Amino acid sequence: MKKIYLLAVALAGTLLTSCSDFLDKVPLVVPSSETFLTNQSAVTNYVNGLYIALPSAGAYGMGIMGEEKNSDNMVAMVYDRRMNGELQESIGGVTEWQKGYQNLRSVNYFLEYYKVPAAEETAEVLSLKGEAYFFRAYWHYYLLTKFGSIPVMDKFWDGNATVGGLQIPARDRSAVAQFILDDLKAAKELLYSRSKYQGLRICKEAAMVMAMRVALFEGTWEKYHKGTDFAAAEYKSDDFLQQVLTLGDELFQMGITLNTKENDKSVKNIDDAYGNLFNSKDLSATQEVLFWKKYSIADNLVHSLNTNLSSGMCDAEGPAGLSQSLVDNYLSCLLYTSPS
């Protein structure tokens, strides 16, 4: 009888030890944050997923054309709550506020757990890391243009973060803009040039143009809102506008050429060369186009832009149309370039 008890105790001890060893193992299916982003394949897959949130001509909406809604160029049937002073962070649904910070969390997860060994940090891996910095700048800029002064998300907040710990004060809009420009500078130092992927991935030149756009936006905002309730706490308009000029000079020294009739052998005049920037199916050889998306039925990358244009649909909120001032501008241009 004692032998049976001893055998039972020994067996129980073995099982407990085995269970303990098994529980110490990393799950085979669920990736570990500590070991996930440690090689080029994992880094590539993760960064590829960040592209999905960028504006494009999907099943609904006009992609980047829809960004013109409620500008001087397009008038929407549904008025812009931001322009009317009604935009709030807490309105139901996936708001602009939620969209921006949800995407920032995804980017910051990558930057927090990126742990590729230095010996394996090839130019390809470093360029992917540069893309992540571009995405973080992009989503901060998205929020800046809609809300002005915002909390900057410069680190990843995991599931253990407390509510109190997430009460991050907003930074002045000028400081937010500079943070964005610093991220784009970091991206520029790591990214490949356009020639590597023919503009199908974020590149060094695209980061520079994005930085110019951010600096121009903030520089002109501070210039024309000086002395108003919307002014930045620290006036840095001249500094931002100077950055636009500096980046522009550097960009053209990198050999970027404009699409003119001399560079585009498929056209006979400058009007057609300009038109090819917007009506070509393949822009890989058009150096002026720094970042674009190639649609392909074979790859199931499709859109409904033609249908939306014919129906006037701009996005899920409804239709939008060209403003009279935009049409007048084009008519004036045609009269100038073709007097006959």
Where are these regions (language model features)?
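Positively charged n-region of N-terminal signal peptides that target proteins for export
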Residues: M1-I4
